[in-house]
Amino acid sequence: MKKILLILLICLTTIVNGAPNPFIEVNSMDKAFKMTGFTLETPATCKNYKKKKINVIKDKMVEVVYLKETNTEGLVIRKSKGTYKISKDVKTIRIGNYDVIEQTKGENIILTTWTDGTYSYVVNPNGTELNAEEMAKLILSIK
């Protein structure tokens, strides 16, 4: 009897691999605001990306992901409370009123972060080639 119960228990158990995904996809910035208390203003399109999706970590972060034509993730912009630190090969430049920390690879910027005093922002081009001028224009359009 014990063996049968053990087999039933094993069959009914759900196996979870890895950590749960903390992101919740929402369909509007209004819903993101309700879940975090803040919004993230980004351009409607960026480079060759025509679509985007909004992800939220409740009370912590809003993320806008620009999607490739294949609906795979491309450029990512995040806004959260607190600060974000890049740990290697960085330089700080001034863009508008922000001291922007950027990590580069050749002529392209592969990660940037800055703060407005309350929120921190991150742009991860995720393989999208952005030069300094394109990144500066993008940063100045984010609020």
Describe each region flagged by the PLM.
Residues 125-143:
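Surface-exposed amphipathic alpha-helical segments
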Residues 4-13:
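Sec-dependent N-terminal signal peptides
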